[in-house]
């Protein structure tokens, strides 16, 4: 039985999204059990609206506090110790759940998850990673997407290690290619942090292909694209906004007159396939990598359909043993990186110089 703890109160909409999504998920995956974490009376009232809810697959975990979307991290972490967000992460720590999911405040979710679960050896900060569809029919793993606004070159190297480990574990790619997001491919481009990170990546055993630009994400030029959380979040929100805009424009154009309506009817199968490929809701659910447990971040604005995919991401992570495999890969790659750095720092033996 796969056990997933849900922060039912988190996100822009809270219970009106999380409870229906949990019910549909439970129906779809009978091998799963859900811990519904939040204000118990509110959860009971939300469940009562769905008479056919599989109640035997749910366990309500009572919380007395809720982390709002605008709560400062310090408040969420230090004062709201009985929040639904905190208790969802604690359920994983205590072994009551195999994974936890929240659509709440990103900064608070990262801080709480990091505090409760701790980071893997060799990792200073967790990073948010997700898959963005590309023209090859596969997907590009991009991280960080907002967990770390300010990063050092060493942090970017660690993100590359985690992204490589994730791609190996989930996409089964033996030697994933890595690119560093920059304003150009040339080595002279970028700020000092990016330049230093590129040098660290070049000296590492990772399959680093150099700097990449934003359009390379959609070309599928590399398997993993690394950037700081500020840039990554802007990229992600831009992609989502563009997808929604294109969907709206296409719909408007096909509804313009009778001829376009007929053309739309003929093109409907193609349009449906296109929508499925680019619908950002189907890619909802980003993994918070680098922790000693499976943590999934849903979009705060996710609807029921999108939140269901975040729950599926959590289930897939458990089934594929993502956390264990990522921990093993991170340990192995980190060791290789450290060995490479040690070798690079050794003085030349006498007689080797010309």
Curated annotation (Swiss-Prot):
Keywords: Cytoplasm, Lipid biosynthesis, Lipid metabolism, Phospholipid biosynthesis, Phospholipid metabolism, Transferase. Its EC number is 2.3.1.274. Pathway: Lipid metabolism; phospholipid metabolism. GO terms for molecular function: phosphate:acyl-[acyl carrier protein] acyltransferase activity. GO terms for cellular component: cytoplasm. It comes from the Bacteria. It catalyses: a fatty acyl-[ACP] + phosphate = an acyl phosphate + holo-[ACP]. GO terms for biological process: fatty acid biosynthetic process; phospholipid biosynthetic process. The keyword Lipid biosynthesis applies. It holds the Pfam family FA_synthesis. It is found in: Cytoplasm. PANTHER family: FATTY ACID/PHOSPHOLIPID SYNTHESIS PROTEIN PLSX, PHOSPHATE ACYLTRANSFERASE. Belongs to the PlsX family. HAMAP family: PlsX. Catalyzes the reversible formation of acyl-phosphate (acyl-PO(4)) from acyl-[acyl-carrier-protein] (acyl-ACP). This enzyme utilizes acyl-ACP as fatty acyl donor, but not acyl-CoA. NCBIfam families: plsX. Homodimer. Probably interacts with PlsY. This is Phosphate acyltransferase. It comes from Bordetella petrii (strain ATCC BAA-461 / DSM 12804 / CCUG 43448). The lineage of its organism: Bacteria, Pseudomonadati, Pseudomonadota, Betaproteobacteria, Burkholderiales.
């Amino acid at each position: 039985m796969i056990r997933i703890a849900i922060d039912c109160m988190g996100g822009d909409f809270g219970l009106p999204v999380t409870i229906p999504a949990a019910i549909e998920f439970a129906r779809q995956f009978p091998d799963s059990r859900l811990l519904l974490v939040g204000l118990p009376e509110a959860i009971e009232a939300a469940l009562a609206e769905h008479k056919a809810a599989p109640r035997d697959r749910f366990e309500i975990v009572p919380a007395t506090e809720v982390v709002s979307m605008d709560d400062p991290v310090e408040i969420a972490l230090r004062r709201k110790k009985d929040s639904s967000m905190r208790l969802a992460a604690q359920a994983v720590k205590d072994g009551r759940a195999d994974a936890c999911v929240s659509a709440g405040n990103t900064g608070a979710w990262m801080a709480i998850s990091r505090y409760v679960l701790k980071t893997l050896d060799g990792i200073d900060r967790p990073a948010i990673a997700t898959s963005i569809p590309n023209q090859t029919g596969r997907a590009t793993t991009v991280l960080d997407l907002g967990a770390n606004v300010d990063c050092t070159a060493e942090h970017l190297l660690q993100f590359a290690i985690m992204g490589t480990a994730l791609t190996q574990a989930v996409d089964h790619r033996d030697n994933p290619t890595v690119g560093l997001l920059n304003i150009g491919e040339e080595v002279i481009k970028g700020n000092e942090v990016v330049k230093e990170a590129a040098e660290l990546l070049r000296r590492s055993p990772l399959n680093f292909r150099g700097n990449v630009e934003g359009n390379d994400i959609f070309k599928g030029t590399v398997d993993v694209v690394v950037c700081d959380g500020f840039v990554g979040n802007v990229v992600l929100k831009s992609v989502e906004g563009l997808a929604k805009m294109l969907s709206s424009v296409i719909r408007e154009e096909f509804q313009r007159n009778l001829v376009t309506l007929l053309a739309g009817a003929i093109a409907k199968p193609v349009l449906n396939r296109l929508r499925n490929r680019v619908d950002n809701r189907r890619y909802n659910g980003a993994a918070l990598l680098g922790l000693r447990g499976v943590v999934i971040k849903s979009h705060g604005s996710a609807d029921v359909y999108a939140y269901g995919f975040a729950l599926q991401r959590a289930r897939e992570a458990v089934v594929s043993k993502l956390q264990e495999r990522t921990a093993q890969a991170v340990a192995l790659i980190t060791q290789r990186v450290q060995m490479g750095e040690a070798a690079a720092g050794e003085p030349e033996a006498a007689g080797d110089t010309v």
